[in-house]
Amino acid sequence: MNIQEIKDLMAQFDTSSLREFLFKTNEGELIFSKNEQHLNASISNQEHAVPVPQVQLVPNSTASEASSPASVKDVPVEEQPQAESFVAEGDIVESPLVGVAYLAASPDKPPFVAVGDTVKKGQTLVIIEAMKVMNEVPAPCDGVITEILVSNEDVIEFGQGLVRIK
């Protein structure tokens, strides 16, 4: 992919309503994002800051290994003792689509679920907004919420964990 093609993609992304865009090729990945979490902290301090599209080119591992400098040294990683590791119990409810997660029906309403709540199969856990459509994510089984893995208004990916039910 040449520079002009990348510039064209960037211009199209900038004028679109997309918040994130990932383009994979044999050469690597091209990631565009308009999300505020990717912005430089100095921009957020300005009075009328406008989100600036961020571009990140991530090369494939074979390309990065070939171009890595010889001065990079392998450092052994020490393993942590098993006693300190935390193993969470329960099943993770995954996102069925890409979108924005909402933990409540509206900002002034209480969340659908909280840690410790008992839920019934089919009860709404989260709403995911995708293309201006609100999609309810139901509980796949009866159980107790042990962990909420996303925050309100997080941009989430397909298959990303939303809540853990035991």
From Swiss-Prot:
GO terms for biological process: fatty acid biosynthetic process. GO terms for molecular function: acetyl-CoA carboxylase activity. The keyword Protein biosynthesis does not apply. Residues 61-82 are annotated as: Disordered. The modification N6-biotinyllysine is found at K132. Pathway: Lipid metabolism; fatty acid biosynthesis. Residues 61-70 have a biased composition (Polar residues). GO terms for cellular component: acetyl-CoA carboxylase complex. Pfam families: Biotin_lipoyl. Keywords: Biotin, Fatty acid biosynthesis, Fatty acid metabolism, Lipid biosynthesis, Lipid metabolism. Residues 90-166 form the Biotinyl-binding domain. Homodimer. This protein is a component of the acetyl coenzyme A carboxylase complex; first, biotin carboxylase catalyzes the carboxylation of the carrier protein and then the transcarboxylase transfers the carboxyl group to form malonyl-CoA. This is Biotin carboxyl carrier protein of acetyl-CoA carboxylase. It comes from Streptococcus pyogenes serotype M6 (strain ATCC BAA-946 / MGAS10394). The gene is accB.
